[in-house]
């Protein structure tokens, strides 16, 4: 292939890749806890015969915008706002532990607690609560319930959200919107 065509094609391919990342960021702008992806481009000289003015472009990696987004007050008992470098542990589709910034917790018909359709991990694995109970979340992530017929003071702890500290750059973004450690080992709870 002619070097000039190759150089032009590499620039067009990288522009398409960057456009896909921007489109994904725009599509997820209202997704709770979403972290925008950032693409960095770098020029590199084309090796071989010819003038040194021929330069190709290559993606230097995809990063993540770790800046804290606005906290939205919902007055919903199962919505949590996480601190700046705090992530919530969830179970990924393959059963491994992954992390998210989403805080819109749900309880399904079996009592399983989830966020974004993924089971929330606590002290001893995925968290479940008794069906029909009123769920309360403490500031430290403690999950307490008041079952039907119990007095208003009768809260029983059933678990604790696994919250982890993750400094920018220590986790890798997955294609499923979750974050993982580079060595796939779970992080310790805070």
Residue ranges with predicted function:
Residues 1-190:
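Amphipathic alpha-helical polymerization modules
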């Amino acid at each position: 292939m002619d070097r000039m065509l190759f150089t032009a094609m590499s620039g067009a391919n990288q522009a398409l890749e960057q456009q896909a990342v921007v489109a994904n960021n725009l599509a997820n702008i209202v997704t709770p806890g979403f972290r925008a992806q950032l693409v960095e481009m770098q020029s590199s000289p084309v090796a071989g015969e010819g003038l040194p003015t021929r330069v190709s472009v290559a993606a230097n990696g995809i990063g993540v915008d770790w800046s804290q987004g606005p906290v939205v007050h919902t007055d919903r008992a199962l919505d949590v706002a996480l601190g700046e470098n705090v992530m919530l542990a969830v179970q990924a589709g393959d059963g491994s532990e992954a992390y998210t910034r989403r805080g819109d917790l749900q309880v399904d018909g079996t009592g399983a607690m989830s966020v974004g359709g993924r089971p929330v991990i606590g002290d001893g694995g995925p968290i479940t609560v008794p069906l029909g109970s009123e769920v309360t979340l403490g500031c430290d992530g403690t999950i307490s319930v008041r079952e039907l017929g119990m007095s208003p003071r009768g809260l029983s702890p059933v678990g604790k959200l696994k919250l982890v500290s993750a400094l920018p750059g220590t986790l890798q973004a997955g294609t499923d919107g979750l974050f993982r450690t580079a060595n796939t080992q779970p992080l310790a709870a805070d």
